[in-house]
């Protein structure tokens, strides 16, 4: 037995009004855009013999974008520069970024984003001073992450970059 309410019976409330929409007229299919030509990634090799044994490349160029792998304080011979000296290590990492970008026909002013990793937050100012000096007023978007350690013993800083080749 249905109970009464102000709106009528509950059984009656379960019945809903149906709204019937008329079907929209058929449209012509939109013209398809031709597919963009595939852009192949290009490996960037700065010519360092020591990095041949690594499972990655120092940079990739895709169209006008250049992705620079994390650079550390290793010189062209693969030797650690500036053990215990964050400024010297930052200088070498930035020099390596510059070298990778140059191999792709770009420069430091083309950098649009940088990510840095340091092992000691107290060394941030020293690292930042050197980076700012080298970038000479150029200010890319940036992130800094403090980490417990980097890939090899003695490393204090690692920096990666994304650049837009003009």
Q: Model regions: which residues?
A:
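N-terminal presequence-like segments and the immediate start of the first folded domain
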Residues: 2-95, 99-112, 118-166
């Amino acid at each position: 037995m249905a109970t009464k309410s102000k709106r009528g019976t509950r059984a009656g409330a379960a019945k809903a009004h149906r709204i019937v929409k008329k079907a929209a007229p058929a449209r012509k299919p939109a013209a398809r855009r031709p597919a963009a030509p595939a852009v192949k990634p290009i490996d960037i090799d700065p010519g360092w013999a020591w990095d041949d044994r690594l499972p990655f490349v120092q940079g990739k160029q895709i169209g006008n974008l250049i992705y620079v792998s994390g650079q550390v304080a290793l010189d062209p011979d693969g030797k650690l520069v500036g053990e215990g000296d964050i400024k010297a290590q930052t200088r070498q990492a930035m020099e390596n970024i510059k070298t990778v970008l140059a191999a792709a026909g770009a420069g430091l002013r083309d950098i649009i984003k940088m990510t840095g990793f340091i092992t000691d937050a107290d060394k941030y100012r020293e690292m930042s001073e050197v980076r700012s000096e080298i970038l000479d007023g150029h200010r890319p978007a940036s992130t800094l992450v403090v980490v417990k350690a980097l890939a090899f013993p003695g490393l204090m800083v690692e920096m990666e970059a994304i650049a837009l080749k003009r």
